[in-house]
Swiss-Prot record:
It comes from the Bacteria. InterPro entries: Kinase-pyrophosphorylase, PSRP, TF_DNA-bd_sf. GO terms for biological process: regulation of DNA-templated transcription. This is Putative phosphoenolpyruvate synthase regulatory protein. The keyword Kinase applies. One of its GO terms (molecular function) is protein serine/threonine kinase activity. It comes from Yersinia enterocolitica serotype O:8 / biotype 1B (strain NCTC 13174 / 8081). Belongs to the pyruvate, phosphate/water dikinase regulatory protein family. PSRP subfamily. Bifunctional serine/threonine kinase and phosphorylase involved in the regulation of the phosphoenolpyruvate synthase (PEPS) by catalyzing its phosphorylation/dephosphorylation. Keywords: Kinase, Nucleotide-binding, Serine/threonine-protein kinase, Transferase. The lineage of its organism: Bacteria, Pseudomonadati, Pseudomonadota, Gammaproteobacteria, Enterobacterales. Its EC number is 2.7.11.33, 2.7.4.28. ADP binds at residues 153-160. It catalyses: [pyruvate, water dikinase] + ADP = [pyruvate, water dikinase]-phosphate + AMP + H(+); [pyruvate, water dikinase]-phosphate + phosphate + H(+) = [pyruvate, water dikinase] + diphosphate.
């Protein structure tokens, strides 16, 4: 089943995308998506409606429209398009208003925009991103006392994207350190990491998956051979066990899932909002 899907917002459209995708993922739908942020005026809304209506005329199938818009005028224009329109935030606001006994006070861009109340947390996330970049792949072992978690693992097991996701999404200062082929003859925990053992967390991966990932980077190399990958993974997992370092097999998990599992296992709190 194929459908055109619109994510529309008067802000970044991140909320519409996340909630809309979460709902749509429950159905066997192949989606052609259109993300339209900052639909703040009637003129812009009319343009969006024309696009929705054009697709309906061409296909004969109503596009699915997930939107989050504060302006009643803009919202009404979207609702009168030829799409199947779902106001994803209002569907939750109405029952919550009844429970709380107070009226909502919507403010444009409050969710993902900068406000006085969230500026400090935004700055913390930027600082966490800077930290992750400065401490990626063992570039620097200085200031590890400032890290909240230090990820360890073989090359290409997911350390860098996980570190950056932890920083961007949760404001977590994450460093990461790679174990490379040259380390394998006498693999030990580096002395610089030992004082921070309580912050260490290992990532591992199935050798077959690791070989496939490395093959894309260095085709037909020793680095990408299944034999090399099996050896490295085995040695590093043994190191984790010897040093009682908690670790996770990342093979079947997305970066989002890996990050969330790390926070859960380590008992770390999120800083999203």
């Amino acid at each position: 089943m194929e459908r055109s899907v619109f994510y529309i917002s008067d802000g970044t459209a991140i909320t519409a995308e996340v909630l809309g995708h979460a709902v749509l993922s429950q159905f066997p739908v192949k989606a052609t998506t259109f993300t339209l942020p900052f639909v703040e005026s009637a003129t812009r809304a009319q343009e969006v409606c024309e696009k929705i209506n054009e697709i309906y005329r061409e296909t004969g199938v109503r596009p699915l429209v997930f939107y989050s818009i504060i302006s009643p005028e803009v919202r009404e224009l979207i609702q009168h398009s030829e799409g199947f329109c779902q106001d994803i935030v209002q569907a939750l606001v109405a029952p919550l208003q009844g429970e709380l006994g107070v009226s909502p006070q919507p403010v444009l861009n409050r969710t993902h925009g900068l406000t006085e109340s969230n500026l400090g947390k935004y700055d913390a996330r930027i600082a966490a991103i800077d930290y992750a970049l400065a401490h990626d792949d063992g570039i620097s072992l200085r200031n590890l006392d400032q890290a909240q978690v230090i990820l360890l693992g073989v090359s290409r097991c997911g350390k860098t994207p996980t570190s950056l996701y932890l920083a961007m999404q949760f404001g977590i200062r994450a460093a990461n350190y790679p174990f490379i082929a040259d380390d394998m003859d006498n693999l030990q925990l580096p002395a610089a990491l030992k004082p921070f053992q309580h912050k260490l967390f290992g990532l591992t991966i199935n050798p077959e998956r690791l070989a496939a990932i490395r093959e894309e980077r260095r085709e037909n190399s020793r680095y990408a051979s299944l034999r090399q990958c099996r050896m490295e993974v085995g040695e590093v997992e043994a190191l984790f066990r010897k040093n009682q370092i908690r670790y996770l097999n990342s093979t079947n998990y997305s970066v989002e899932e890996i990050s969330t599992k790390i926070l859960d296992i380590l008992g770390m709190s999120r800083r999203m909002f």
